[in-house]
Regions:
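Short, small-residue-biased leader/transition segments that mark boundaries at the very start
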Residues: 1-4
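Glycoside hydrolase catalytic-domain context in secreted enzymes
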Residues: 9-310
Length: 310
């Protein structure tokens, strides 16, 4: 619902010659009423750009799926010319002309490269950190990118974990302040401006606390420790108005975060009042089969019912 509005609202006047619905709800309901079930499912798909990066967009398999309404967005596609070429397929050749979202890992800069997140956090300089995200947003948006998979705010206290350098370290307060600064830097005060991009706080939740420091491993933690030591940076990003949240790979209470309704609905939606959209990490849904949660159809339903939207 939210994803459809974010991607279509920018193109509503150009793509629809009739008078656009007055409110967001009316706009979305009108669009949904015209969509087939396959097109609705298609909006859930966020594939990598695949052969578009090496071949002509119009002749690629991904392009064919876009034309058939089976793709909601793409990630890891770069350059204005390539993004424009692919977007034209969506808004000119697909039945409903719903534009695509374009996401990329804009982590510590885009064209201008800043220190890694752990290095930035060591400055304790929030205006500087916010400014780095703002510069990255300006450069990425100029290239046609709408959405970054950042900030990563996972608290980590085990140096064996291989992704420590991507976060802000072990301190929940510092991590929370950086989360707010990064969200503000990326999104600014108005996401409709063409020099801002949608932020995505990740990886929700507890991804930096796997047993033995092994990536993707399970997490066994009390609720008191979760809320006091690991949740604060995610909550700070939500309070700052982050537009999207990425689910983590790890299990929490024996259930992968991607299919964990307590985490994605009870905590994120009901307790924290988050009103953006939730995306899986790369292959997050099929990897639940390795956790023994069922076949692909079963884990897909588990994720959707838990609150996953893309």
């Amino acid at each position: 619902y939210t994803t459809l509005f974010r991607s279509t609202s920018l193109f509503a006047q150009k793509g629809n010659k009739t008078k656009a619905p007055v409110s967001k709800s009316e706009f979305i309901e009108d669009l949904l009423s015209k969509m087939t079930l396959d097109e609705k499912i298609g909006q859930l798909n966020l594939p990598t750009s695949g052969d578009i990066t090496t071949g002509q967009a119009n002749s690629s398999n991904v392009a064919k799926n876009i034309e058939e309404g089976k793709v909601g967005g793409l990630f890891n596609i770069k350059t204005v010319s390539k993004i424009r070429e692919v977007q034209k397929i969506a808004v000119e050749k697909s039945r409903l002309k719903i534009p695509l979202l374009f996401g990329m890992d804009v982590i510590h800069g885009y064209e201008t490269t800043f220190p890694i997140p752990l290095g930035l956090s060591s400055t304790w300089n929030m205006p500087l950190i916010e400014r780095s995200a703002q510069i990255a947003a300006k450069e990425a948006s100029a290239d046609g990118i709408n959405w970054t998979f950042s900030p990563m705010v996972d608290i980590s206290r085990d140096p064996r974990w291989g992704r420590v350098s991507e976060g802000s370290g072990e301190d929940a307060y510092l991590g929370s302040q950086i989360a707010k600064a990064m969200v503000k830097g990326y999104q600014g005060n108005d996401l409709s401006l063409n020099n801002t991009i949608l932020a995505c706080v990740k990886h929700f939740a507890l991804y930096g606390a796997p047993e033995a420091g092994r990536d993707y491993n399970t997490v066994d933690m009390s609720r008191i420790r979760m809320y006091n030591e690991y949740f604060p940076p995610y909550k700070a990003a939500v309070d700052a108005g982050v537009g999207s949240v990425m689910a983590s790979f790890n299990e929490i209470d024996g259930i992968p975060a991607t299919g964990n309704k307590w985490l994605m609905t009870d905590v994120l939606r009901k307790q924290w009042k988050f009103n953006g959209f939730v995306v899986t990490d790369y292959t997050g849904i099929p990897e639940m089969t390795d956790h023994g949660m069922g076949d692909l159809q079963t884990v897909s339903a588990l994720a959707l019912n838990a609150g996953i939207e893309l």
